[in-house]
């Protein structure tokens, strides 16, 4: 009994519905690689995060003086001072200076921007617009500074202004504060210096672009993740309401941050986060395929299908996703990039091999195998497939386009010198004998196309030559036909002349004979008349 593996999101209501047949496609070198859920996103709102860069340390019984904190504070001030000055230059141009421009009533320091594109000027406008919220958040800096909580909400009345985060505070609370009275000051200082040094290294890496110009270089959420430390998932969940995991959103880079204010005295940084709106399209899957060469009609070929398709229910489209962000389980796009597929391509995806189109290939660097869920799918007619455990060569019959090698076939496989351990069984319970016509193979490579064009041009030249020869023959036949027509006409005229002559002769003969008869009768009458005259005289 044959078991088909078909992906189709919706229920097939009509018998003509088309779904992707994974098993059949795998047998011709078109292997499913990844399936992702399609979602759309747009930047719609903003949130603010207050990052407290200097942790609070509880006082100890022996009144330790931590020199590492003082040195860390000094180094951090040197790091953040250029950023703070740059933000102040952009957000607060000097009153006497006329070198600034207004966007909707907002004054921007053009000199601080330098050479800026439209997008960079827009970022500067956003930075200036955020100053109102930044000042409201900074007004509550004392409450933020006093707390030793790793994360908490900054509220003004009932309105949430921001989320305060102390990335290293969580480690201080859970490890350092519990050991303050059990270790010597030197050991605690060294341990704290290690944590602060590592965190400072991350900050230097994160904010290196912002040292030039924070308005022109927004920080990505990946860099912000280093800034937030272990509090990143909690911050993401607090700022973004979605069922998609924080790891997926962060890895896609959908959230970007921009430093809008730096409070050097308190070592606090206010970061504006652009929060996307994410909508997941139901019943929409984006399937990635990996094509390897196959043995078709005694030559190495590759199937002509897109590397990525979109399937909604029983309909398929090509989906390039050039402007989308991909994660392991999701694909985030700002708009639909679907492109129509021909009916033949859809039939091929459904497992109708007679509708598939292949292209012949040549060369030694073609993709000829792929690992699939612990098994290997390979074109063993174009590369050497040797099983080492047990030891025997793997032969691919002529009627098989590729070979699927699983644990029942081989345990250790060598492909052109590369060794692989097979750890799984194949889920394909059957293999069809493929029959593919020669008309299904076309050339798509530029070199092959030019070769085929040369053949076509040669055929056209031969055709032109034959046409000229045929025209010459036709012209000869035409001249001979004219001469023949003249001869025939002459013969006809001659025959007509002879017939007319014969008729004239016959008529003359008859007329002469009639005249003689009439003359004879006339003479006879004259003789009788003279005889009568003689009798009368007597």
From Swiss-Prot:
Residues that span the membrane, as ranges: 487-507
Keyword Glycoprotein: yes
One Pfam entry name: Fusion_gly
Residue ranges, annotated region (Fusion peptide): 103-127
PTM statement from Swiss-Prot or TrEMBL: The inactive precursor F0 is glycosylated and proteolytically cleaved into F1 and F2 to be functionally active. The cleavage is mediated by cellular proteases including host FURIN during the transport and maturation of the polypeptide.
Signal peptide: 1-19
Domain of life where this protein originates: Viruses
GO CC aspect terms: host cell plasma membrane; membrane; viral envelope; virion membrane
Gene3D superfamilies attached to this UniProt entry: 1.10.287.2480, 6.10.10.110, Head and neck region of the ectodomain of NDV fusion glycoprotein, Newcastle disease virus like domain, YojJ-like
Biological processes, Gene Ontology terms: fusion of virus membrane with host plasma membrane; symbiont entry into host cell
Coiled coil segments of this chain: 128-156, 452-477
Disulfide bond residue pairs: 324-333, 348-356, 380-385, 387-410
Annotated membrane topology: Single-pass type I membrane protein; Single-pass membrane protein
UniProt-annotated site: Cleavage, residues: 102-103
Assembly behavior: Homotrimer; disulfide-linked F1-F2. Interacts with host LAMP1; LAMP2 and LAMP3; these interactions promote the cleavage of the viral fusion protein F.
Written domain comment of the UniProt record: The 2 coiled coil regions form a stable six-helix bundle.
Membership in a protein family: Belongs to the paramyxoviruses fusion glycoprotein family.
Protein name as annotated: Fusion glycoprotein F0
Organism lineage: Viruses, Riboviria, Orthornavirae, Negarnaviricota, Haploviricotina
Gene: F
